[in-house]
């Protein structure tokens, strides 16, 4: 939408007015503004995003985590841990760790083990998903 495009250029202004728009427009604005803010610095991104409602923060954090998962998985994991909604947080962490474990399994497993936001059963579930993913990728087909 045109409003989302404006958010790419004027993220602070658009986020300050976020409550004036419908939920689907808010989501697009948040995504575009997140990219624009993160280009400046991660600190700018976090400062502005922290002023949003919890639901809108979750959208921004999930988007940013997905964006970082290929280039900076540790930071992606850290951002995913900021998500308030437990189900969304778990999905985002699992997604990040699945990508991360493809090129640095040890670091991914360490991040899971060190997380204070994941329960023991969630840690076990994510770890087993990684093991299954790695096992299936090591199968040699005739």
State the predicted function of each range.
Residues 1-142:
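Non-catalytic all-alpha helical scaffold/repeat segments
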